[in-house]
């Protein structure tokens, strides 16, 4: 009779022989809110989660679509509220301290380190040196850290610089996509078993394929494969006043967000998030439309209706729902999350224990 396989012995052997080997599962334990409940849900499957540490997330979109607002503003603010240290790498030379303060970001170096870089190699070296020091720390001393690169599209390769100095503008001939892919791939491997995450913004360009109208992300597809979450964003004009009435002038933008890739929820779902110039993003923006599309809210005349599990009927006009009148959306989110979790638990075997 063959001897049973000694897993513990094998684990000890490979742990000793392979430096930096991580064994077991690395499920995210820390999540950072995007500042919008609907977007959080489409990314992570939970209204209060959002972007995880230990993974790479990319927000890609055209200029002015709200990428920096969400990544360099909302994510940084919520990370700081959770005690997560933020390293903000500004490649566009566009993030002013006054603008960050207006979004509620604490720019003190004890909570935020802002670096201005232009070279892909410099960004890679910075992250690599940080991770060497990070791994040398005792487990109890390791902080939770979020890297934000705003943006990948503006990063340069040494070839770009050399050609520019020589007056040669033919471009890097495909070196940049390879360098970006290498950067993201290395980050994925370095961050996997640690409470360190990367969020990056990137640019998009119009698709030339009539059968695939979605905008294409610049820099190739390599880093898209390596990323855990990819959100595509498009800029639309917001022509509404504070009460939601239609007006002629533009008072903000509507960020149309489409989840191109996620490992925590159903992909290719979309939401429109309103960002007025005067008041900023509401955490409830787009949530009413999302719940109606999912079938949770039913239309009755000019009202939207939600029936709770206890038979209570929550009914209000659309503007009442969008304004979260009397906390009506909070009630729905609380129960809707429970329904989603119960569906997940029902598809497991009776002997399995479902944990969050």
Model-predicted regions and their roles:
Residues 1-22, 32, 238-356:
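C-terminal regions of RecA-like/P-loop NTPase motor modules
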Residues 2-109, 124-132:
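The Walker A/P-loop phosphate-binding site
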Residues 5, 30, 34, 38, ...:
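Charged, alpha-helix-enriched surfaces in structured cytosolic catalytic cores
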Residues 95, 155-156, 207-208:
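Catalytic P-loop NTPase motifs of RecA-like helicase/translocase cores
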Residues 108-121, 227:
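A glycine-rich helix N-cap at a beta->alpha junction
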Residues 118-193:
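Phosphate-binding/switch loop-helix module in NTP-utilizing enzymes
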Residues 173-294:
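Phosphate-binding/switch region of NTP-binding enzymes
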């Amino acid at each position: 009779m063959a001897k049973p396989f000694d897993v513990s012995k094998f684990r000890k052997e490979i742990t000793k022989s392979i430096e930096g080997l991580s064994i077991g599962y690395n499920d995210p334990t820390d999540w950072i809110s995007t500042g919008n409940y609907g977007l959080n849900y489409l990314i992570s499957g939970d209204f209060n989660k959002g972007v995880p540490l230990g993974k790479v997330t990319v927000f890609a979109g055209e200029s002015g679509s709200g990428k920096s607002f969400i990544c360099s503003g909302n994510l940084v603010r919520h990370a700081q509220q959770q005690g997560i240290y933020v390293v903000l790498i500004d490649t566009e030379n566009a993030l002013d301290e006054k603008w960050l303060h207006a979004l509620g970001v604490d720019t003190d170096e004890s909570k935020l380190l802002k670096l201005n870089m232009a070279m892909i190699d410099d960004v890679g070296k910075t992250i690599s040196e940080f991770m060497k020091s990070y791994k040398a720390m005792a487990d109890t001393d390791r902080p939770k850290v979020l890297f934000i690169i705003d943006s990948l599209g503006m990063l340069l390769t040494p070839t770009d610089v050399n050609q520019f100095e020589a007056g040669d503008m033919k471009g890097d001939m495909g070196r940049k996509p390879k360098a970006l892919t290498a950067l993201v791939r290395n980050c994925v491997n370095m961050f996997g078993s640690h409470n360190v995450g990367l969020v990056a913004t990137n640019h998009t360009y119009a698709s030339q394929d009539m059968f695939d109208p979605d905008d294409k992300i610049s820099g190739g597809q390599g880093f898209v494969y390596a990323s855990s979450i990819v959100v595509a964003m498009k800029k639309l004009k917001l022509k509404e006043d504070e009460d939601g009435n239609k007006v002629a002038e533009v008072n903000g933008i509507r960020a149309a967000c489409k989840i191109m890739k996620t490992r925590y929820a159903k992909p290719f779902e979309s939401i429109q998030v309103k960002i007025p110039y005067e008041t900023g993003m509401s955490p409830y923006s787009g949530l009413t439309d999302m719940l109606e599309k999912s079938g949770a809210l039913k239309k009755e005349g000019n009202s939207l209706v939600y029936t709770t599990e206890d038979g209570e009927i929550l009914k209000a006009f659309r503007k009442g729902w969008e304004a979260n009148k009397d906390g009506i959306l909070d009630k729905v989110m609380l129960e809707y999350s429970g329904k989603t979790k119960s569906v997940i638990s029902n598809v497991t075997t009776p002997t399995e224990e479902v944990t969050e």
